[in-house]
Amino acid sequence: MTALLHELRRNPLLWLLVFVPGVFVAQRLDPDAHTRLFVLSVLAIVPLAALLSHATESVAAKTGDTVGGLLNATLGNLTELVIALAALRSGQYMLVKASIAGAIVTNTLFMLGASFLLGGLKHHVQEFNRISARLQASLLFHATIALLVPSVVRVAESGPPSAFTRQLSLGLSVLLIIVYGLGMLFSLKTHRELFAAAEHEGGDEPPWPIGLALATLAGVTVLVALVSEVFVESVQQAAVSFGMTPAFVGFIVVALVGGAAEMASAFSGARKNRLDLSVGIALGSASQIALFVAPLLVLLSYLIGPTPMDLQFWTGAVVMVLISTLTAALVTNGGRSAWFVGVLVLVVYVIFAMTLYLLPPAAE
């Protein structure tokens, strides 16, 4: 508790935690004030993300950057999963797929590029474990193939999705989950020594006790998920007020807010010259969404969805995911980065965001 109070005094950003109960009070008093709920939920997620960042760094200091990055990605992706489950129950499969594709693109381009930029502005050249980065990029590329196949098959068909497409998506979902499990076994158990993080100078602040850090990770992640539910309920109506298209909302806004906790950890790690942690969070989170979250949602759609969901994405989403994956694989292949590399990656993300923002609704 003393460590938490010290963090509150040290980081003024955490005073925004007052907006967390404010979100639920506002929802209770006026659930139709969507624009107000949208703004409050965003302000509430920011300090929760900062708190989660420090807790994750404390766990990483005790367990190593690989395990710390995996743990942060797992808890951070709970937000995306909760958002998708809410849309899944109501049958909003387009929103589910947009949030999945958007999360992959945001992690591989925005989070990775911003980490390279922020770290490079403070440190001339940074190094990271390229073996771990190559594994995550390879897993992500294989998942992209699984997303591409049903979409290619669908182009050759006419009419509504066939039983073949759904059966193929079901089989691919099981296969992807198996591959993800084997990837974790490879990196965390049988070949763990290949993924050991390089030694870096410690931060200015001592890490929290492991028990407090784990409890904070779990508790704050739950709060982020709850606030994100309020966010997703209000974001569509609020988007109209701000002039945003539905495609931009699902692909960009939901992904940015849902991944805020992971981004805070990745950016902080990059500034402290712990780029292994940043790359592990960005690529680990993206591969986990593609290999675990997406297929899990397909399986859960048979239980809680009005109809089974498939892995058929619209062509533009598949192309963006494929380009993002190839870009991430290219920039992480050498195991070194500088600030200009981050700029180049961010430019690709801005191109996608600009396209989706200006995309006519009829073309989505």
For every predicted segment, state its role.
Residues 1-364:
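Hydrophobic alpha-helical segments, chiefly the membrane-spanning helices
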